[in-house]
C-alpha cells in the first residue's frame, strides 16, 4: 500500500500546528494524483483528465467554527486515498483558516468572507489568507475551459433556520446558474437557494465573477465543534458531492429546492440600529407586508412584500456593512440552460 501523504488525515494534519506541512505528491494505484501544496490545500487529479473534465474547488473553513463541511471533506479524501471514492473530476480541497478553527471562532480579526472584492482593506490575518486564496483559484483554473469550472464554498449557519440547508447563488456578469448546478442542488436535497441580485465580496462570488465558475455559498446545518456535527442530516449532500467528484449519475431521488430572490440588502447606516427580534431568530423568518421589525436611526425597517423573509440578520455589524438580506420566494425557469426569474 502506498504511504499516505498525511500522518493522520487531511483535516487532522491541517489542524496540528505543531507539525510542519511541506508540499508533497502521491500517485495512487488507480492513477489518481494527490498534490499537497500547503497546510489545508490539496489538489486531486483524475488519471486521465481532458478539456471536458470538471475543475471543482471545494472550500470550507472560511469561517473557522463551521466544521461540518471539514468532516465531510476529510471523509471523502480518506475514501479517495483508499480507492473507494472514484475520481473523474479535478478537485481543489481547501480548509481555509485552521488558526480560527483551533480558536473555535468565525475569524480572528476580520470576516474573511467579506474580503474578496477589489477594495483596499486594512492588513489582517484574514486579508493575507484571502490574497493567498485568490492566487490558488487563479492557478487552479489556469488553462481550463470556463464551462468546466465549479466552486462550492461550504459553510454552516450560526443560527437556526426554517431551511436546514440552503445555498446562495452570487450575482455576476456571467451565466453561472446552469441547469447542471441546479440539478446538483436538487440531488443534494438542499432545501432552498437564494438568487443574489447584486455583487458581493464572498469567496464564491469571486470565483464566479472573475472565472465564470458555477459557484455557490452553501449553508449546511448549524455551527458545532468537530465531532458534534449532525452529519446524518447531510447524507444527501454528501452523496451528491461524491457523485459530482466521480462524474456519476445519482441513484437516489432528487428533491427540488425552493428558489428565493434577494429583494433587498439591509445595510447598517447609523449607530442607533436594532431589530425588534432577538439574536436567536431563525433564518427565513417571514413578515407580513408593512410589518416593522427594526430601525436604522429614525427610519423604521419594515417588510415591503407579503411573506418577505429575513436571512443572515446581524445587528452587531459595523456601519456600512450588511445587516441582513430580505428575500421572497420566486418562480423560476430555464432560458438557454440558465436559471432565470421575472
From Swiss-Prot:
Q: Which UniProt keywords apply?
A: Arginine metabolism, Hydrolase, Metal-binding, Zinc
Give the domain of life: Bacteria
Instruction: Please give the catalytic activity noted in the UniProt record.
Output: N-succinyl-L-glutamate + H2O = L-glutamate + succinate
Q: Which InterPro entries match?
A: AspA/AstE_fam, AstE_AspA_cat, Aste_AspA_hybrid_dom, SuccinylGlu_desuccinylase
Q: What does the record give as EC number?
A: 3.5.1.96
Question: A GO molecular function for this record?
Answer: zinc ion binding
Q: Which residues form the active site?
A: 219
CDD domains per UniProt? M14_ASTE
| Cofactor dependency | Zn(2+)
Its annotated pathway reads: Amino-acid degradation; L-arginine degradation via AST pathway; L-glutamate and succinate from L-arginine: step 5/5
User: What is written in the cofactor note of this entry?
Assistant: Binds 1 zinc ion per subunit.
Give me the residues that bind Zn(2+), please.
Answer: 63, 66, 155
An individual GO BP term: arginine catabolic process to succinate
What does it do? Transforms N(2)-succinylglutamate into succinate and glutamate.
UniProt family annotation: Belongs to the AspA/AstE family. Succinylglutamate desuccinylase subfamily.
**Official protein name in the record:** Succinylglutamate desuccinylase
Organism listed in the record: Vibrio parahaemolyticus serotype O3:K6 (strain RIMD 2210633)
Amino acid at each position: 500500500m502506498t504511504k499516505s501523504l498525511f500522518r493522520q488525515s487531511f483535516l487532522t494534519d491541517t489542524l496540528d500546528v505543531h507539525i510542519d506541512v511541506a508540499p508533497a505528491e502521491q500517485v495512487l494505484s488507480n492513477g489518481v494524483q494527490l498534490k499537497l501544496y500547503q497546510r489545508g490545500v490539496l489538489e486531486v487529479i483524475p488519471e486521465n483528465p481532458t478539456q471536458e473534465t470538471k475543475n471543482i474547488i471545494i472550500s470550507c473553513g472560511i469561517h473557522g467554527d463551521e466544521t461540518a463541511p471539514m468532516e465531510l471533506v476529510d471523509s471523502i479524501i480518506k475514501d479517495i486515498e483508499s480507492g473507494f471514492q472514484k475520481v473523474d473530476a479535478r478537485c481543489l480541497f481547501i480548509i481555509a483558516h485552521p488558526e480560527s478553527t483551533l480558536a473555535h471562532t468565525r475569524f480572528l480579526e476580520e470576516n474573511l468572507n467579506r474580503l474578496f472584492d477589489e477594495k483596499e482593506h486594512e492588513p489582517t490575518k484574514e486579508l493575507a489568507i484571502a490574497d493567498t486564496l485568490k492566487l490558488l483559484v487563479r492557478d487552479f483554473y489556469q488553462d481550463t475551459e470556463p464551462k468546466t469550472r465549479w466552486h462550492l464554498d461550504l459553510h454552516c449557519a450560526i443560527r437556526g433556520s426554517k431551511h436546514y440547508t440552503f445555498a446562495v447563488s452570487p450575482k455576476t456578469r456571467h451565466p453561472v446558474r446552469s441547469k447542471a448546478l441546479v440539478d446538483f442542488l436538487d440531488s443534494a436535497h438542499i432545501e432552498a437557494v437564494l438568487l443574489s441580485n447584486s455583487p458581493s465580496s464572498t469567496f464564491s462570488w469571486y470565483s464566479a465573477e472573475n472565472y465564470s465558475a458555477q459557484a455557490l455559498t452553501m449553508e449546511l446545518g448549524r455551527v458545532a465543534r468537530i465531532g458534534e456535527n449532525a452529519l446524518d442530516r447531510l447524507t444527501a449532500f454528501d452523496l451528491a458531492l461524491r457523485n459530482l467528484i466521480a462524474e456519476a449519475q445519482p441513484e437516489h431521488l432528487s428533491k427540488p429546492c425552493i428558489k428565493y430572490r434577494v429583494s433587498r440588502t439591509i445595510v447598517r447606516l447609523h449607530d442607533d440600529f436594532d431589530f425588534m427580534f432577538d439574536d436567536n431568530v431563525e433564518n427565513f423568518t417571514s413578515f407580513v407586508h408593512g410589518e416593522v421589525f427594526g430601525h436604522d436611526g429614525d427610519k423604521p425597517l419594515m417588510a415591503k412584500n407579503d411573506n418577505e423573509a429575513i436571512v443572515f440578520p446581524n445587528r452587531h455589524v459595523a456601519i456600512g456593512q450588511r445587516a441582513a438580506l430580505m428575500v421572497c420566494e420566486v418562480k423560476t425557469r430555464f432560458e438557454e440552460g440558465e436559471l432565470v426569474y421575472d
